[in-house]
């Protein structure tokens, strides 16, 4: 989705396809270790699945690009720093063509919720 970009060692890149229905957020996440997509039924479950994926792969950065024809609606999540269950990174929002920076998991969740309310 994006061109060349400097990425800190140990960072992680994922893609999120989200659906909001009746105040419920569901979707699939894609990336290293989840190439076929991991479904989730809530944002809290998404966070737990992302934690598990990052724990199992360790600090090895694996570039992953979505396959040709992948949905243009997917959000691109880049977790640049992760320590003590806190994340910092950026989320690219395709519908509005912007990038949001977050300094905690809570801030990431608020960005996602606000994106779907707008």
Segments from the language model and where they lie:
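Mixed-charge, glycine-accented linear interaction segment located at domain edges/termini
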Residues: 31-38, 47-50, 91-118
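Short aromatic-glycine-(Arg/Gly/Cys) micro-motifs in beta-strand/loop hairpins
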Residues: 18-34, 82-96
């Amino acid at each position: 989705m994006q061109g060349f970009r400097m990425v800190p060692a140990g960072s992680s890149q994922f893609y999120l396809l989200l659906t909001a229905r009746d105040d419920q957020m569901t979707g699939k996440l894609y990336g290293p270790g989840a190439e076929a997509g991991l479904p989730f039924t809530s944002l809290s479950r998404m966070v737990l699945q992302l934690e598990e994926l990052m724990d199992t792969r360790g600090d090895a950065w694996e570039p992953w690009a979505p396959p040709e024809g992948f949905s243009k609606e997917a959000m691109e999540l880049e977790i640049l720093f992760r320590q003590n269950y806190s994340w910092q990174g950026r989320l690219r929002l395709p519908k509005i063509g912007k990038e949001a920076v977050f300094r905690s998991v809570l801030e990431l969740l608020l960005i996602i919720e606000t994106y779907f309310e707008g």
